[in-house]
Amino acid sequence: MANESTTIEIGESSTMTKRTSHVVVDEKKKGFVAATAGGGYKRGLAIFDFLLRLAAIVTTITASSVMYTAEETLPFFTQFLQFQAGYDDFATFQFFVISIAMVASYLVLSLPFSIVSIIRPLAAAPRLILLISDTVVVTLTTAAAAAAAAIVYLAHNGNPNTNWLPICQQFGDFCQAVSSAVVAASIAVVFFIILIVISAISLKALILYFSSG
């Protein structure tokens, strides 16, 4: 009886060991599958983030360069006066050119962080840095675009209450150029909003993944 009891105990121990090993293997497989699926989802968001940053770079460079080159001289002039309009005649447009150029430079510098997010989709630090930085930069972009839009509106419509006459009837090409620059900057603002949403979604997914793991 003692031998039979010993034999039964060994059998139960072996069975429990096998079950435990199967459970550990299954848990590892589940963890690997979850990490692979989560990483693929976040890598897709990171790739979209990178492409969107490239588009924003093109948009901001276009906005800044178009505003910088906006200039028009009327074909008629007097002996002492020449009618000319340029971006440097308006402090707001100068602020626009400098600010949007800084935004374009930031976007170029942010590309390595976006690439790191593609290579390591489960890394939270690059995504957090991009989220904070994008939030700050979108404020600057919005301020520059809004200020320039106000001047463009006055250039097109004037202000009868202050006797400010519209100048776009005379400087049509100049107004068209600055209006295009403002539109491009506004598109860049939309890009930044999408980038911020992408970073927020990625961080939320990372928090849920690590908390559940």
From Swiss-Prot:
It is found in: Cell membrane. The modification N-acetylalanine is found at residue 2. GO terms for cellular component: plasma membrane. It is a multi-pass membrane protein. Residues 65-94, 156-180 are extracellular. It comes from the Eukaryota. The keyword Transmembrane applies. The chain crosses the membrane at residues 44-64, 95-115, 135-155, 181-201. Keywords: Acetylation, Cell membrane, Cell wall biogenesis/degradation, Membrane, Transmembrane, Transmembrane helix. Its main location: membrane. It holds the Pfam family CASP_dom. Residues 2-43, 116-134, 202-213 are cytoplasmic. One of its GO terms (biological process) is cell wall organization. NCBIfam families: A_tha_TIGR01569. Homodimer and heterodimers. Regulates membrane-cell wall junctions and localized cell wall deposition. Required for establishment of the Casparian strip membrane domain (CSD) and the subsequent formation of Casparian strips, a cell wall modification of the root endodermis that determines an apoplastic barrier between the intraorganismal apoplasm and the extraorganismal apoplasm and prevents lateral diffusion. Belongs to the Casparian strip membrane proteins (CASP) family. This is Casparian strip membrane protein 1.
